């Protein structure tokens, strides 16, 4: 019973029958111009701690932006808390990990019968926009301006120089 060893996934689903969006795990969506997300309860706190640690390490001259991009020792500092938080999978937040998902932890967004443009996405887009092109541009701007993700947008991970993002990305846009 070690959740940190389990494969986990997030999922966002549109139910045509129920006219609902179901959010399991950390994902996000746009319904028209309305933004919805479903972050893990302590994700922002962990991101803030990582950002503070990165700023401290750089202020003390122990690390640089470049060195942190290669080996993120600020992330290393929060790994124990991230692992500890995994004990709460499908208790305080929902994920797909092979165990029962508590229905009350699935975020449900009901839709009326108006026509809607819907965007469903993973949390790999720090700034979700109404088109994939705009979302990718915002991601590229984030990478250029703050590759460590410790400024305006804070994350538990930085961009890695050999990868094109800091997290998984999925995006779909459709109309109902």
How would you name each of these model-derived features?
Residues 30-85:
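Surface-exposed beta-loop interaction hotspot
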Residues 77-176:
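C-terminal catalytic subdomain
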């Amino acid at each position: 019973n070690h959740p940190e060893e389990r494969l986990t996934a997030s999922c966002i689903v549109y139910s045509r029958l129920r006219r609902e969006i179901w959010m399991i795990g950390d994902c996000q969506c746009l319904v028209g111009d309305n933004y919805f997300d479903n972050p893990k309860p302590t994700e922002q706190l962990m991101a803030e701690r990582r950002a503070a640690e990165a700023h401290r390490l750089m202020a003390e001259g122990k690390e640089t932006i470049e060195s942190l991009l290669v080996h993120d020792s600020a992330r290393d500092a929060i790994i124990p808390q991230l692992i500890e938080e995994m004990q709460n999978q499908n208790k305080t937040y929902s994920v797909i990990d092979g165990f029962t998902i508590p229905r009350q932890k699935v975020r449900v967004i009901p839709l009326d019968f108006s026509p809607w443009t819907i965007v469903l996405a993973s949390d790999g887009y720090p700034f979700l926009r109404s088109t994939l092109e705009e979302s990718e541009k915002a991601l590229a701007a984030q990478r250029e301006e703050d590759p460590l993700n410790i400024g305006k947008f804070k994350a538990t991970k930085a961009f890695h120089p050999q990868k094109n993002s800091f997290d998984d990305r999925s995006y779909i846009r459709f109309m109902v």
